[in-house]
Amino acid sequence: MKLTCVLIVAVLVLTACQFTAAISQTQRLSKKCIEDNHACGLLHHSPYCCNGTCFIVCIP
């Protein structure tokens, strides 16, 4: 009985992880990146910049 419960919980956790990973990948693929020298915000590693580096503008 305990083993069955553990297996059910493990399957549910793995399913949830796969589901969130799929949603994350879909969102990442659907966003268009900001071209170099266009405004992106403050200093941070931006997923919206095509090259990923942001310092007020996307740095080439």
UniProtKB/Swiss-Prot annotation:
GO MF entries: toxin activity
Cysteine disulfide links: 33-50, 40-54, 49-58
Tissue: Expressed by the venom duct.
UniProtKB keywords: Disulfide bond, Knottin, Neurotoxin, Secreted, Signal, Toxin
One Gene Ontology term, aspect cellular component: extracellular region
Keyword Ribonucleoprotein: no
Signal peptide region: 1-22
Keyword match NAD: no
Compartment(s): Secreted
Record comment regarding domains: The cysteine framework is VI/VII (C-C-CC-C-C). The presence of a 'disulfide through disulfide knot' structurally defines this protein as a knottin.
Function: Probable neurotoxin.
Family statement: Belongs to the conotoxin O1 superfamily.
Name of the protein described by the UniProt record: Conotoxin Cal6.29
Lineage: Eukaryota, Metazoa, Spiralia, Lophotrochozoa, Mollusca
